[in-house]
Amino acid sequence: MSGSKKKKVTKAERLKLLQEEEERRLKEEEEARLKYEKEEMERLEIQRIEKEKWHRLEAKDLERRNEELEELYLLERCFPEAEKLKQETKLLSQWKHYIQCDGSPDPSVAQEMNTFISLWKEKTNETFEEVIEKSKVVLNLIEKLKFILLETPPCDLQDKNIIQYQESILQLQELLHLKFGVATEILLKQASTLADLDSGNMEKVIKDENVTLYVWANLKKNPRHRSVRFSETQIGFEIPRILATSDIAVRLLHTHYDHVSALHPVSTPSKEYTSAVTELVKDDVKNVEKAISKEVEEESKQQERGSHLIQEEEIKVEEEQGDIEVKMSSAEEESEAIKCEREMKVLSETVSAAQLLLVENSSEKPDFFEDNVVDLCQFTTLGGVYHLDILELPPQCKPVKGWMIVEILKEGLQKYTYPPETTEEFETENAFPPIEVTLEVHENVIFFEDPVVVRWDAEGKHWRTDGISNVSYKPKERLVTFSLDTFGPVTLIQDAHINMPYQSWELRPLDVNKVLLTVTTVFTEIQIQIKENLCMLSSIKLKDKKHISILEGTWMTPIPFIIALKEAGLNIFPTRHSHFYVIINNKVPLVEVKAYRQMALLSSAFAFGWSKWNLLCNSTKVVFKVREHLTEACTENPNWALLMFSGDRAQRLKIKEESEAFSEALKEETEFHSTLYHMVKDFASEEAMEKVRSSNCQFVNSVCHMLLSTRLLSYS
C-alpha cells in the first residue's frame, strides 16, 4: 500500500528543479536578446543602406534637376503658344466681324452695344415671333460677353471692362424680357379673334429653340371651366373659381435660359499672387532691356573702332564696315529673338496665373442664408425659368366698318394681383387657394434626383423654397406638379455637387492628339473626347444604361463645352466654393497644377488613372496610375505603374494598387526625377516619347484645361 503512494518530492529536489527552470529561462532570455540584437543590427544595417541609397538618389536627382527643368520648360512652351494662337484667332474673328458689316455689334465695344440697345428700344409693335427672332441675336451677344469674361486670362481683365460687360449683359436681359411682355400684350389684344371655337377662350402655344410661350385668355368667364390644359400637352393649371370668372389671361413663358438669377462673380487672382506674377514679369523685362542695351553699346563701340581705322587705313575701312553691318544685322535678329522670348515669358506667366486660379479654394464660405433661401453656390438652376403670370385681359380689338378699333392703355400690360392685397370683403377663409401648376421638365436636362421647385423673391433678389406645396414628379413623363401661393418666376434646382466626389477616373489616348476622359460618379459615367482645341461628350451611362444627350457628337471649345454640360445637369466641374459642400481629398494647388500640366503633356502616349492611394498620401503629394498606351491592345492587358508626385519630385512606388498598406518605398531599380516626363521616360519606349514631343500645343492645352476644371486629384 505504501508502494502505491506517490513519492514525496524533497526540498532539495524542488530547489534543483527551480534552479534548472531559472537557468533555462535565463538561457532563453539571452538567446532572445542576442536574436533581437542581431535582427536590430540587421534592420539598422538595411536602414543605413536604404538611407545611403536614398541620399545617393536624392543627390543624383539634384545634380540633373536644372537640366530636367530646362527640358520641361521647353516642352511647356506649348501653353503660351496655345494662348498666342487663341489671341490670334480672337483678333481674326473680330476682323471678320468688322468686314462682314452685318449690323450686329461687337459685344466688347461699349459704344456699339449702346447703339444696338437704343435702336431696339425705339422699335415698337413687334409681334412675339419677331421678338423671338431678334432674341437669337441678343442671346448670342449675351453668350459672347459671358465667354469673354470666362476666357480672358484674369490678369488681362480690368475692373472697368468687367463692369462694362456685366452691365451690357443685364441691359440685354432686361430689354429682352420687356420686349416679350410688350409682344404678349399685342397678342392678348387679339384674343377675341383667336378664340377657340369649342371653349370660346383663347389658347396659344408658340415654340422655339430658346423660348416657349403658353398663353390662355379667359373670354367666356365660365365658373365651371377651371382646368386649363394646353393642346397636345399635359402642361396647364387648375385655377380657383374667382379667377375662372375674371377678365384675366394666364401666361407661362418658359425661357430655356436663366436671366433671373444674379450673374456669377468673375474670379480674379489674389493681390499676393498678382503682385508675385507682376514682379516676375517686371524682372524679365528688366533683364531683356539690359541685354538689348548691352548689345547696342557693343555695336557703338564697334562703330567707333571702325571710324578710327578709317583715318589710319582706307583699305581696311571697307572690310571693317562690312563686318560691322553683318554684326549689326545679327544683333538685330538676336534683339528680335529676345523680344519674342520676353513675349512668350509674359504669356507663360499669364497662363500659369489663370491655371492656378482654376484650382484655388475660397477661404470664405458664401454669405449666411436664412431658412428657405437657396444658396446658388450649393444648388444650380436647371432647364431654364418658367415665368408664371396672371394678367389683366387688355381691351379687345373690335371690327367697326372695316376697321379694327382697340383701346390703348398708357400703362401697358398689367398683372392681376392674386391673392388681392386686402381680402376683408371675401367671407370664406379659402377664397384664394393655391393654384395647381403642371410643368414639363426640359428634355435636354438630366435630374439624378427629383427636382426641387423654387420661386423667385423679387424683393430679396433670391430663390426661395417656401410658398410651394404638394410637389410631385413623374420621371417617365418628365412632369412636375405643385401648388403655388402666388404667381411669379419659378425654376427647378438640383444639388450642384450631386456627382462629387467622383468614384474613379481615367484619361487614355485614342489617336494622334486625341484622348478620352472617363469620370465615374455615384449616378453616372461620363466620357469626354478631347482633340486639338475641342471637346465632345462621347457618352453618358445612367445606372448601366446608355443615355442619349443632345450634346453627344457636338465639338466645342473647352469653356462653352463646360457651360453646356453644367446646363444639362452634368456638373463635374468644382468651383472655388465647392470644398464647403463636398468632402474632398484636398491637395496643395501648385502641386495639382503641376501634375495636370505634365499629365496633359504626356497624354498623347500615356494613360492615367485613379488610385486609392491618393487618399492616403498627404496634401503635398498626389498618387495616380500610369502606363504607356500606343495601341488598343494596351487596354486589354493594362500594366499600371504607380507614381507619386510632389510638384518637385516624381517617383515610382513599390506598392501596387492591390497592396494591403500604403508605403512611399521606391520601386527597385528606379530613381527620383524632377518631372513626370523624365520619370516615365525611364520605362517608356522611344516611340511613345517621340509622340509626346510632337503633340499639338492646342491639344495639350485643352487636356490641361479639362483636368484643371474637373480637379480629378482633389475631388476623387
UniProtKB/Swiss-Prot annotation:
GO terms of molecular function: beta-tubulin binding; microtubule binding
Subcellular location per the Swiss-Prot or TrEMBL entry: Cell projection, Cilium; Cytoplasm
Changes after translation: Ubiquitinated. Ubiquitination leads to its degradation through the 26S proteasome. Ubiquitin-proteasome-mediated DNAI7 degradation occurs in mitosis.
Keyword Signal: no
Keyword field contains Oxidoreductase: no
Protein origin, superkingdom: Eukaryota
GO CC list: axonemal dynein complex; axoneme; cilium
Keyword entries, A-Z: Cell projection, Cytoplasm, Ubl conjugation
Subunit composition and interactions: Part of the multisubunit axonemal dynein complex formed at least of two heavy chains and a number of intermediate and light chains. Interacts with tubulin. Associates with microtubule.
Family: Belongs to the DNAI7 family.
Reported function: Via its association with the multisubunit axonemal dynein complex, is potentially involved in the regulation of cilia function. May also act as a cell cycle regulator.
Name assigned to this protein: Dynein axonemal intermediate chain 7
Source organism of this protein record: Homo sapiens (Human)
Lineage: Eukaryota, Metazoa, Chordata, Craniata, Vertebrata
